[in-house]
Each structure stands twice: as structure tokens, then as C-alpha cells.
């Protein structure tokens, strides 16, 4: 796990996003923006923050790092997986396909808190169930 280098800017970037989210919340509470606008701005802020953390991770990851070399060569993994391992998981979708406003701020190296763990596990379980159902459907259609 020592190969997964957490970017030092991560906490600053998350704190900056929290400040922006608080400003959006104040605008919403004053009635200056609608709930849909608040939702869209919140999602945009967290997507931008996740991208910034990913960029900081890529910039701080040494080129001779084993994890980086595997992803860069295409042998195993991708930068998205490295982002989840050492950056931040980011935004996830609920069962209806809508993006949840609260991102998973932690990564697998730091460890997820209980809420982040259950949200993440639910998404993984749903993905496995969907795959199993699609496999059964395609098998039936080949008859």
C-alpha cells in the first residue's frame, strides 16, 4: 500500500469545495437559486474537485511507481482505479441513476467511514446484480 501516494493537496481541495458548497447552500436558503440549480452546482463542484484531486495525484505520483507503471502501460488497472485507491472515490449514482450529492471523500488507502462504505457497497452489489440479470436475459434470447 505504500505505492499508493495520497496527494498532499487533497485536504485543501476538499476544504475549498466545502466552502463553495456552503456558498451555494446560502444562495438556496435565501431563495436566490432553485433546488435544481443547487443540485446541479453541487454536482459540478464535486466533479471539479474530484478531477483536481486526480490531477494532483497524477502529478505527485512518481513515474517509477509500480502502480503508475501498471496503469500507464495498460497491463492492469487505470488512472480511475488509482484515483479511487489514493485520491478520492468521488460521486456515485443511486438506484434510479441520479448522482448522489454527497461524494465519497476518502480513498481505499485511508479507509472509508461506515456511511461511505455502505453507499459504495450498495453500488457494487447493484452492479453485480445487474450483470447477472443481463447475462440471464441474453442467454434466454439466444434460444
Labelled PLM ranges:
Residues 1-143:
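Append "with occasional cross-activation on large, charged helical scaffolds in nucleic-acid assemblies
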Amino acid at each position: 500500500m505504500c505505492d499508493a501516494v495520497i496527494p498532499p493537496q487533497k485536504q485543501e481541495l476538499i476544504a475549498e469545495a466545502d466552502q463553495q458548497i456552503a456558498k451555494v447552500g446560502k444562495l438556496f436558503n435565501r431563495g436566490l437559486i432553485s433546488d435544481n440549480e443547487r443540485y446541479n452546482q453541487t454536482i459540478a463542484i464535486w466533479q471539479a474537485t474530484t478531477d483536481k484531486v486526480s490531477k494532483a495525484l497524477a502529478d505527485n505520483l512518481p513515474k517509477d511507481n509500480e502502480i503508475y507503471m501498471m496503469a500507464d502501460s495498460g497491463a492492469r488497472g487505470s488512472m480511475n482505479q488509482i484515483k479511487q485507491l489514493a485520491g478520492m472515490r468521488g460521486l456515485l449514482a443511486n438506484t434510479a441513476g441520479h448522482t448522489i450529492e454527497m461524494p465519497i471523500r476518502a480513498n481505499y488507502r485511508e479507509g472509508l467511514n461506515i456511511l461511505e462504505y455502505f453507499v459504495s457497497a450498495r453500488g457494487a452489489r447493484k452492479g453485480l446484480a445487474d450483470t447477472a440479470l443481463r447475462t440471464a436475459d441474453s442467454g434466454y434470447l439466444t434460444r
